[in-house]
């Protein structure tokens, strides 16, 4: 099998990446098969069935074409792609396969963001949508996300069905396709019209509302991705021009040369933005990840000091400020079960109903669809990993609408001689100070997968837990879909889908553990209202030392 793949190396689109791999890395591409999981596909480049290349992309596309023809008589798909290596090439390969096998494809000629894709699926009434992106992963990654007709990512059941169709493609090296030029001439692959982009921009403008003043100054960065120029265009339309762009960090560039990883969850991502803010005396720095579904912010003060806000803190700001703006009598917040503990306390304090879902924004999208006819107003949907949604004209994380609204709130606070930090401190004074931390432990190769399983098996067996002076209350085991009262041993069913997640709830907050759905990583979530927060984190890490599990 390996020889057949090597014979087609020059056609694979990934020859230059293959040539940089070690022998072990090359072998790993043949030890596994890329699977379409509940989070889509995400991997590194290389040859073999376990890596991203022209042939594994075409295999996905043929399976997807057969899946679409099963659910629709006249399937139509819109594809968007980000600024990563091979994103455009992969989108064209998918378009060729889909078009050859009976699916109409809408294909833009330049990069677009994830929220634009989610919006376009609904706006154009397509059967499905595809986003080529690996979000904020390192530059040698790419991936595929699939969206249903509602604009949300595919849920578990349709994902499994699609996966079956993909698995039925047994000869990915010899899939016959028509050329793109012919498919375009026959109007099977059709161009993406600017009207959809204008409709999305109008939806964001309607959400945010025009600026009446512009005294606060903002630095914008796309981290070499897709949020610019659309975000700057929207701000101009909203009568806000008091911003500067960190141009060296906002040129589309697959290498992401100005950052280690293009991830606004990491504070050092803002180093260049801070320098520009100093030169420009700006008050706010906003950075979005490459596909513009996540964002981060840093606030700068008159004395030149700055404050970085983590994902939970941004959520608290949005929850409080949007609640005050809406003044709705019946409202709700949708969040993941690993989102910070204080968000639920704040929602309760503000009389906002809370809907908890599993990790993954597709579960938030599912709730949005279920609530379409509900009279309650959505205040905020968010995850701690810097993903937010204020209005469901998009059905995935939307850093563009969120950025515009945060800039508007910053301007309003400036008029009141207030800052985001002031708003957060008021919340802490009222409800207590919680600290949040998310750790990503990376495990490499097949051995790493075994280590992750070993750790999760350990947690799966626990009926109680001791960490410092924390008082354990409940263990929520989403693997078993059981919630256990630590004191009484009483068990109850968790009314959410099964997931590889265990959450330890204490009187002081929670600690949760789960493997990543897209990468060989273990994620640990800490959200606690304690003085010795770092001590608790260190003790927990010592206790799960993989050599002693």
Placement of each model-derived feature along the sequence:
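N-terminal small/polar loop signature for handling phosphorylated ligands or for N-terminal nucleophile
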Residues: 78-141, 234, 241-297
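Short acidic, glycine/serine/threonine-rich loops at helix termini
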Residues: 88-93, 118-121, 140-146, 229-234, ...
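Phosphate-binding and adjacent anionic-ligand microenvironments
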Residues: 278, 282-284, 305, 325, ...
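Conserved phosphate/anionic-ligand binding catalytic regions in large, soluble enzymes, centered on
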Residues: 30-50, 135, 222-230, 234, ...
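Gly/Ser/Thr-enriched, mixed-charge loops and adjacent short helices
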Residues: 25-34, 142-271
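An N-terminal, well-structured beta->alpha segment
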Residues: 2-94, 101, 182-183, 187-218, ...
């Amino acid at each position: 099998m390996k020889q057949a793949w090597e014979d087609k190396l020059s056609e694979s689109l990934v020859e230059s990446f293959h040539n940089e791999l070690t022998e072990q890395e090359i072998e790993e591409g043949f030890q596994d098969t890329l699977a379409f999981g509940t989070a889509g596909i995400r991997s590194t480049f290389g040859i073999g069935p376990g890596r991203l290349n022209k042939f594994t992309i075409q295999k996905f596309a043929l399976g997807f074409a057969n899946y679409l023809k099963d659910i629709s008589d006249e399937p139509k798909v819109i594809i968007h792609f980000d600024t990563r290596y091979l994103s455009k090439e992969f989108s064209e390969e998918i378009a060729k396969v889909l078009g050859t096998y009976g699916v109409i494809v809408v294909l833009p000629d330049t990069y677009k963001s994830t929220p634009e894709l989610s919006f376009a699926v609904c706006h154009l009434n397509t059967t499905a949508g595809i986003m080529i992106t690996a979000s904020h992963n390192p530059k040698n990654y790419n991936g595929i996300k699939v969206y249903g007709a509602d604009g949300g990512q595919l849920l578990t059941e349709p994902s499994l069905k699609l996966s079956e169709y993909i698995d039925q493609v047994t000869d990915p090296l010899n899939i016959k396709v028509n050329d793109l030029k012919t498919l375009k001439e026959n109007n099977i692959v059709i161009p993406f019209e600017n009207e959809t982009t204008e409709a999305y921009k109008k939806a964001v403008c309607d959400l945010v509302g025009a600026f009446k003043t512009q005294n606060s100054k903002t630095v914008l960065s796309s981290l070499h991705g897709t949020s610019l120029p659309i975000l700057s265009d929207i701000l101009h339309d909203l009568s806000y021009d008091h911003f500067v762009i960190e141009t060296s960090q906002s040129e589309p560039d697959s290498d992401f040369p100005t950052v280690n990883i293009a991830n606004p969850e990491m504070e050092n991502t803002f180093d260049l933005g801070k320098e520009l803010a100093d030169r420009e005396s700006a008050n706010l720095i906003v950075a979005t990840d490459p596909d513009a579904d996540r964002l981060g912010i840093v606030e700068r003060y008159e004395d030149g000091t700055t404050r970085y806000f983590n994902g939970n803190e941004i959520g608290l700001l949005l929850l409080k400020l949007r609640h005050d703006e809406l003044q709705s009598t019946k409202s709700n917040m949708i969040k993941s079960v690993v989102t910070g503990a204080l968000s639920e306390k704040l929602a309760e304090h503000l009389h906002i109903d809370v809907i908890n879902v599993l990790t993954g924004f597709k579960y938030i999208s599912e709730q949005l669809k279920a609530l379409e006819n509900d009279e309650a107003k959505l205040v905020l949907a968010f995850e701690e990993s810097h993903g937010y949604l204020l209005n469901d004209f998009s059905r995935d994380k939307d850093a563009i609408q969120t950025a515009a609204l945060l800039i508007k709130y910053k301007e309003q606070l400036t008029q009141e001689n207030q800052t985001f930090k002031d708003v957060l401190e008021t919340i802490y004074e009222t409800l207590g100070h919680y600290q949040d931390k998310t750790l990503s432990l990376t495990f490499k190769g097949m051995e790493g997968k075994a280590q992750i399983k070993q750790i999760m098996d350990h947690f799966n067996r626990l009926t109680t837990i001791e960490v410092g002076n924390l008082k354990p209350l409940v263990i929520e085991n989403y693997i078993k879909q059981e919630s256990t009262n630590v004191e009484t041993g009483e068990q109850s069913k968790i009314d959410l889908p099964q997931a590889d997640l265990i959450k330890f709830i204490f009187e002081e907050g929670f600690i949760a553990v789960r493997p990543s759905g897209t990468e060989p990583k273990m994620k640990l979530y800490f959200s606690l209202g304690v003085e010795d927060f770092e001590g608790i984190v260190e003790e927990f890490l010592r206790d799960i030392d993989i050599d002693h599990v």
